[in-house]
């Protein structure tokens, strides 16, 4: 395991991880508390199936309990099946509806964000795929807002891809363009960025990447998916490793944190045990500047 070398400073990034909900949302809250999470991500339904999220009997307890242990933001991850950029009208419509339903379901749990993959143009061309993605995001939000009424609606965040095949939004420029046109913000996955061509294998590279994020995305950057990369630079192959066990330099993390102040970070790294996972959270907090959050 890596040890932080950065000089302690006031930490502004809230640190969390993706947690399972299979044992119930009360268990999710317990794990979050035991691991010292300050933000959390979860699925509101089976990410590999089109089934509509079922009402959660423990939703009220979660909505009450998350603020009590200062989980902020609460993040949901949308289904992997969603492809708003698909050239297939049937798949696209199903994706729009699925995202709308998940926005409403996430809102019922008090979630602030729903991360959705940017999808693929499936060989129909990047320009057309990006246009469909923008329209799909706008339509899904409108459908969800109509269903949710006056209640506060979770905000969709579009995520960068690894750039494999016909995937969209592997570059920050395209990600920013889509986000601006759709009126949404973004989630940047560090592992995706590295394998897509943004070099995080050195601290110098991390400084440049953070600079690019600042100039292209600015305030639209709402969340980091903090994952080490299983595969190398420009490999365009997805795969997450625990922090310090992949291809991203151990000295890159402090460079990102100091240049992206206030951006919450959620790990989607492999589970080991609750105790080992808690130690990983502690490590990342130190890499981000120190254990206590700045007031």
Per-range role (PLM):
Residues 1-78, 82, 86-101, 290-295:
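N-terminal pre-domain/capping segments
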Residues 8-9, 30-37, 54-75, 100-110, ...:
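Acidic (Asp/Glu)-rich catalytic clusters
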Residues 13-19, 38-42, 74-78, 114-116, ...:
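Hydrophobic faces of well-ordered beta-strands that scaffold small-molecule active sites
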Residues 18-22, 45-47, 78-81, 119-121, ...:
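Active-site beta-loop-alpha junctions enriched in small/polar residues
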Residues 40, 139-241:
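Acidic/histidine-rich catalytic cores of soluble enzymes
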Residues 68, 84-188:
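Active-site acidic/histidine proton-transfer and metal-coordination neighborhood
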Residues 90-103, 126-139, 172-177, 207-211, ...:
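Short, electropositive alpha-helical surface patch
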Residues 261, 269-277:
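Flexible, acidic glycine-rich loops studded with aromatic residues
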